[in-house]
């Protein structure tokens, strides 16, 4: 059956700021306390979406979350009206305020893991929400992510959205950032590659930075998504590259159809994995980048592998890259050599995503890949699909509500909370989502 890959990109939230919350993510740590520009950030993302949609790659949007997230502060023991809580936490525990104000939901590669209908035992599209329990600020996301996905993929005859795994370290799940699908045509059955950093009985794990994804979680997600067991491979990421800042597999590898583009040091037992894929995937091609041409540290600094690999109608592939790749002499030299060689990657497109990149999120972090047949695509909430009208409306919305500068100190401003809630109220109507945010369901206690 004919199917296409649709990229659902996350909209950057109104509280996008640099707080260094993500240990193991070196860009996040390096840019801590710098001033951010939320309006520029959301527009950089919108420009990427629109440019790819105009080039014929189907695009859709996933909204940001409610931030600052007052319910989490109430769970931590802060009391009073919303405004009183903001004041208390800013004075007593400002790091908590930064955590509950993180715009990290924009990196929707961590929102869920997706199984196309061609791979599922029941013939439906499955999405399992990620629990993201390695980081407090990200562990807050799962309930609202689930509500948003149910509002977008609302036809239960076509889609099954599964709640996140239990919030325990044993079942740490980071979503599609640790998942690849390889095969021929999108509508044909493929091989799903689940990548983990640790497993309970295995002493091979990183020493410096945490391995966020467990094998136990990957296996549970594969079961929930009803992936045909004959179409699954579980592989461990190289713990040495995790210790060099490769906190998700999509920082060191990206796949599309029959191509796996990765660093030569991406996986533990990489030769064994490549041979498995060669046996299981017709026409499989591994493009392994040697350390002599691009070091792991340069790959992390430029996010070379946090790129999007997209199929064009003629069968060739487009590599969507952050500007940092173009700015790095060695990486750019390698990329120009790559597209001149005999392989499906024949073109590159560079985007300025510096606001997201400074927090450790490149082009691939900002999108969730969902393979859909035409019938399934028609069943998606049409209001989230990117087109000229939505692009214009979202830019006007951003101009109205987003600030052009934000620091950690600004997060205590009660006006920012009110601006955010008003913006999300408007957005849910624009995208026909219903009342998906807690403040819409309970009413806001502004005091």
Curated annotation (Swiss-Prot):
Instruction: Extract the SUPFAM superfamilies matched here.
Output: Pentein
Its GO biological process annotations read: arginine catabolic process to glutamate; arginine catabolic process to succinate
Q: State the InterPro entries in the record.
A: AstB_sf (IPR037031), SuccinylArg_d-Hdrlase_AstB (IPR007079)
For this protein, what is any one GO molecular function term? N-succinylarginine dihydrolase activity
| Catalysed reaction equations from the record | N(2)-succinyl-L-arginine + 2 H2O + 2 H(+) = N(2)-succinyl-L-ornithine + 2 NH4(+) + CO2
Q: Which is an annotated Pfam family here? A: AstB
Gene3D superfamilies named in the record? Succinylarginine dihydrolase (3.75.10.20)
Name the EC number(s): 3.5.3.23
Where is substrate annotated to bind? 19-28, 110, 137-138, 212, 250, 359
Pathway involvement of the protein, from the record:
Amino-acid degradation; L-arginine degradation via AST pathway; L-glutamate and succinate from L-arginine: step 2/5
Q: Which UniProt keywords apply?
A: Arginine metabolism, Hydrolase
Q: Which superkingdom, per the lineage?
A: Bacteria
Where are the active-site residues found?
174, 248, 365
Q: Which PANTHER family match?
A: N-SUCCINYLARGININE DIHYDROLASE
| Protein family (similarity comment) | Belongs to the succinylarginine dihydrolase family.
Q: How does it assemble?
A: Homodimer.
Q: Could you tell me what this protein does? A: Catalyzes the hydrolysis of N(2)-succinylarginine into N(2)-succinylornithine, ammonia and CO(2).
Record-linked HAMAP family: AstB
This protein is called N-succinylarginine dihydrolase
Q: State which gene encodes it.
A: astB
